[in-house]
């Protein structure tokens, strides 16, 4: 049975370890899509958080991105708190992808 893009996204996202983040673009590519914005929409409907850790997905610039369908406010504060609890350093809403990025090639 062929997996949907959403199923592929959720499956691949579970590979991102604690203390690392991936980007919408990297996640889209490894799931076989060019639609990184679509990945964001898929993650907004994540039925299995935190087992499927959508808080570990950020923008390609390292900016924190959205969370739970929001781009600011309490949800973003929660995302930052979750990442920091896992050892990811967030400076002014930005994460150093050189240090914390997981591009699925490791």
Predicted segments, located by residue:
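Nucleic acid-binding interface residues in structured DNA/RNA-binding domains
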Residues: 1-106
